């Protein structure tokens, strides 16, 4: 459960991400594909090379979903319901992949905003991404 301080930290961190969200989403996906090659199996139709338009487009989708989650941090289950259905019933993504992408997002954010990535912000973002992952996997059951 996100505390009021966590919510404040997440909103402040995401505000700093701003217009770079799509780029950071794509970078996190690239990082995930390189670090955890098994995740590529969900994207057999993608050009997974560095700078790929398909990876950039999907990175923007990831970033847009996270922006939506930040905007609706008090009601993420409703805000992410359609996305949860998509990943659980149509795409059938292994839930562990959300944790892997979350880790890669944290690394990406830390690389781009080292001064802002304090232990408290890191912990808040980690809790937030874990909450998003929980919501996205809630319909697997």
Curated annotation (Swiss-Prot):
GO molecular function, one term: peroxidase activity
Organism: Nycticebus coucang
GO BP terms in the entry: hydrogen peroxide catabolic process
Gene name tied to this protein: HBA
Name of the molecule in the record: Hemoglobin subunit alpha
Subunit (UniProt): Heterotetramer of two alpha chains and two beta chains.
Entry-annotated residues carrying N6-acetyllysine: 16
Matches recorded under InterPro entries: Globin, Globin-like_sf, Globin/Proto, Hemoglobin_a-typ, Hemoglobin_oxygen_transport, Hemoglobin_pi
Paired cysteines (S-S): none
Coiled-coil residue spans: none
Modified residues annotated as Phosphotyrosine in this record: 24
Tissue specificity of this protein: Red blood cells.
KW Nucleotide-binding (keyword) present: no
Cross-referenced PANTHER family: HEMOGLOBIN FAMILY MEMBER, HEMOGLOBIN SUBUNIT ALPHA
An annotated GO cellular component: haptoglobin-hemoglobin complex
């Amino acid at each position: 459960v996100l505390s009021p301080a966590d919510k404040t930290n997440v909103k402040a961190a995401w505000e700093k991400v701003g217009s770079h969200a799509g780029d950071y989403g794509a970078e996190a996906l690239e990082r995930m594909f390189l670090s955890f090659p098994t995740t590529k199996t969900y994207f057999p139709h993608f050009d997974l090379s560095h700078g790929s338009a398909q990876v950039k487009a999907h990175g923007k989708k990831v970033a847009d979903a996270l922006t939506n989650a930040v905007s609706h941090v008090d009601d993420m289950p409703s805000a992410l319901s359609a996305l949860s259905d998509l990943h659980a019933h149509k795409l059938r993504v292994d839930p562990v992949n959300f944790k892997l992408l979350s880790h890669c997002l944290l690394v990406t954010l830390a690389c781009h905003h080292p001064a802002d990535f304090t232990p408290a912000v890191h912990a808040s973002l980690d809790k937030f991404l874990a909450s998003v992952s929980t919501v996205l996997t809630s319909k697997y059951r």
